[in-house]
Structure formats: structure tokens, C-alpha cells
Amino acid sequence: MAFALGVSQDYPLILAANRDEMHERPSAPAEWWKDCPNILGGRDLLAGGTWLGVNRKGRLATVTNFRHEADNQSTISRGHLVSDYLATEGDAENFREKIDKEKKVFGPFNLLIFDGAIFHYFSNRAETARLEPGVHAISNVKRGTTLPKILRAKQGLEKCLSANDLIKCLFKLLSDANTYDDLSIAEETERMPHDATLFVKGPYYGTRSSTVVLFSNRGKVRFLERSFTAKGELRGECSYSFTLPENSKSAP
């Protein structure tokens, strides 16, 4: 995933992310949750959490696993980290304390939370950090790791910031199934399977959905999602837009 924080004058936060997952894992497309009406996002129908979501107060959260590190099968689904933050009333510091107490029961994770002003990074494999304004990218590895797909995502988002059609540019970036092993972007990194492409195609594992989230300087949020088949063909798409409460923070 890649996101721009405090870079665009029109959009204090721009996020573009792909969800790569086993095709057999059941999930639902993004919607306002019936059992928690303030949460908007897709849903993991196996464990009940989500990989990416926002709430009506302007919070955002998203999580990744560590693809090259084995999970403890007895752990709680990482998707609950996202839904728990979006459902809570506490601030980021309170949530950090909660994670510190419970992080051992989760498999390896990167968790990003946005409270409407500040982007926080949490992990049970790396140090907590407050992310500064700028363009960032992260994948299924520790923050700060350099991989072809991470560099491609960051560079692609930087170019999209000046595009005439921002949303179109972001979805085009997320649909990029090319590899970059023969370019300088890969010469600086260690080559690993699937780490050189943004959009993963495969019969068992691949990109299940692409999501673009925009927080505007006018207090509006747009949440757009496209879902895909195992062949990488478009399965469906949805778009949501809502206005934040006036007392919500609107800029990093």
C-alpha cells in the first residue's frame, strides 16, 4: 500500500492499497457494517475483522501480515486490530497500550492507524512510530524494508499526485501486474517471489481487492473499492462518500 500524508493541498490523506489473500478465504465487499454502523470497510467472513476500514469520525486503520514469516495457528485474527480501533473511543496512545498488552496473541503484523490528524505505525515485529508528512509505502515486511513493489508503489503515488484524474491514476497503479526485475528499481533490492509486482495473479493466492481512500480538505471522505476474481478480472466495485463531523480533525 502507499499513502500521501499532508502532501496534497486538496487531500490531506490519500491512500491506495491492494489486499492480497488466498482466494478461498471468504470475504465481503466494502459496506457500512450492520452490527457496527460507524465502520465502513470490507469484511473477513472467516474471522470477522477487516484489512482496511474507516469510520464516520474520520479514523482509518489497515493491517498487513508478514508473508515470509509463519503464523501461530492459535492466534487471534489481525483483522480485529482494525475493527477494534475503528470501534473504540480511546485515542491512539490508549490503543497503543492495548496493543502492547495483547500483541503476542496476534500473528506478525503491521498496523497503520490514522486518527484524523496523525498516522501511527504499530507492529509486533518492529518499533512503534509516528509517521511524518510525506509519501510512504509499506508491504508484508517490516517498515523500512526496501522491495521492488514498495519502491514502485511509492514512486507511482508520487506521480499520481500531479495527475488530472487522481482516482483513475491510483487504480491504474494498483492494477500494475508488471515485474521490475530488469529495471534499476530491482537492482537495489533482494529479489523475492511476488515482491516485484503490485497486482498479484495466481490460482490460489492473489490480489482480491484494490481500495482508494481520499480525505479532502473540505471534510469529506471517499472510499472506493474494486474486487477481483482469481484470474484478475473485475468482479465488482463500490463507492462511498460521506462528510466528517465538524469537530473532527481534518489535516495532518
Model-identified regions with their sequence ranges:
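N-terminal nucleophile
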Residues: M1-P252
